[in-house]
C-alpha cells in the first residue's frame, strides 16, 4: 500500500504550552499505520511557536488528511491544525 507524507502545522493553545509534551501527545494519539517522522518548532510572534510535523500516513485513507486533522485537533493543548504539504511516497 502506498503512503503519503503530510506536513502539518500545529498551533498550541497558548505560549505556556510545552511543545515537546504536545508533540508526544500527538504522536501517542496517531492510529496504526501513521508515523511521526520529523518535527521542528517555528517561531510565530510574541514568543508563540508552532510545531511543524512530518507524518507518514496510508494513501487510501477515506477523507484524505481530514481524519488526521481532526485527530490532532482533539489532542489537549492544540489550538489550530493546518496541512501545509502532501506528497505521495514511492
From Swiss-Prot:
Q: Which family does it belong to?
A: Belongs to the EF-1-beta/EF-1-delta family.
Q: What does this protein do?
A: Promotes the exchange of GDP for GTP in EF-1-alpha/GDP, thus allowing the regeneration of EF-1-alpha/GTP that could then be used to form the ternary complex EF-1-alpha/GTP/AAtRNA.
What's the protein here called?
Elongation factor 1-beta
Q: Which organism is it from?
A: Desulfurococcus amylolyticus (strain DSM 18924 / JCM 16383 / VKM B-2413 / 1221n) (Desulfurococcus kamchatkensis)
Q: Which UniProt keywords apply?
A: Elongation factor, Protein biosynthesis
What the entry lists under InterPro entries is as follows: eEF-1beta-like_sf (IPR036219), EF1B_bsu/dsu_GNE (IPR014038), Transl_elong_EF1B/ribsomal_bS6 (IPR014717), Transl_elong_EF1B_B_arc (IPR004542)
Alphabetized PANTHER family for the sequence:
ELONGATION FACTOR 1-BETA
Determine if Protein biosynthesis is one of this entry's keywords: yes
Q: Tell me the HAMAP family matching this sequence.
A: EF1_beta
Pfam families, alphabetized? EF1_GNE (PF00736)
Query: SMART domains in the record, alphabetically?
Result: EF1_GNE
User: Which terms does the record give in the GO molecular function aspect?
Assistant: translation elongation factor activity
Judging by the UniProt lineage, the source's domain of life is Archaea
